Amino acid sequence: KPVFYRVLQGSIVDKTAFMDVVTASGCRECVIIADKGFYSKHNLSALMSAGMKFILPLREDTVNVEPEFYENTDDHKFDGVFTYNKRAIWYRKKASGNRGNFIYTFRDDHRKAELQGNYVEKVEKHYGEQPRHPMDVLKETRMGYFSFCSNMDKHPKEIYLDYKERWDIEQCFDYLKNSVSTSASHAHTDEYFRGWAFLNHISLLYYYGLINALRNT
């Protein structure tokens, strides 16, 4: 459930604001689960300097996973496999650098099949400016793969499940966007806006209280 909020000036860069909020919250025993785009050497260093645990998704073109790994079609390249919602999830865990970080790489075959199907369908319908052939899908070796950088030495399935919990955060954003009035966000005074933000936080607490009650019934 939401435990902290802070009003920041709109001129502050998102990534800078994030670290300011982490510092102000006094958060210690927690795990930072970010979204794609947050990972960078600067942000990674800031989190490690603050002593924070983290799970940071990497971009599809990340250099933290060697291209040969994607090109290798032998599934023995993985450390193992587990199931999630009746889907096979292949995984590999690899140490990164000398500061205790790991790169966790997963492949979801169900997701891979969806992406391949979408690719072939677009080719058949002649989407895009460049001429392509359906068999070009074989060149897209990274389909279905996703990777995380984390400083937690855990079984890959635990990392995967921890990241999946971010859905609760997405629900929070959806609630704020779709269920809470945004008219007050254009208030002309700081006091009015801060009051609106406080009521939003209280509203979220009640919302999550209801969600948790329904989950436990």
Tell me what each language-model feature is.
Residues 1-217:
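Anion-binding and metal-coordination hotspots
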